[in-house]
Amino acid sequence: ALKDSARINNFVPFYIPFWAFSTQIAFNWEAEVAHTVTERYYDSSSKSWKTRTRIEWRWENGNVQKTYTNYLVSGVDAKRLNPVILKNLIPFTMDNLVSFDPDYLVGINANAYDVDLNNAWATAKSNIRDEAKDLAVADASNSNVRNLSIDMNYSNERWRYLFLPVFIAVYQFE
């Protein structure tokens, strides 16, 4: 059954719309970073020297820059296409993109855009900001941080909309 379904004519092609964003980010960060401090002390009850470890929080700061090229955000509302499935489709190979031609859609299903440019850009910026937090933590001298503050700037913002191909195969499992 599965072997028979693997024939290429059982795959159904369709196009999913995406917004692709390219931008450069630069941000300054500041956070309290945990440092382990080991101390020796004299325990008068046992009349011996002992060692204890404590956490000392120190302020650190830094700056990070990163370039994003073709950062994809789905143009399909999450209610229509499961985000978990969608996440497993990404990344696409973007090296062979071609300019849109309506003839490419002849005989192939394509979803229309549900997500407009402003909402897609807001999603991209939110996701990039989450990644920036991880970049800031990685830039710190220890991954245990608190009170993280980020001041981020975007530059060279560009966008385009894409139809990316997906193939679906359905088979019945017995």
Residue locations for each model-derived region?
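Charged, low-complexity helical/coil segments in non-catalytic cytosolic or luminal regions
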Residues: A1-F173
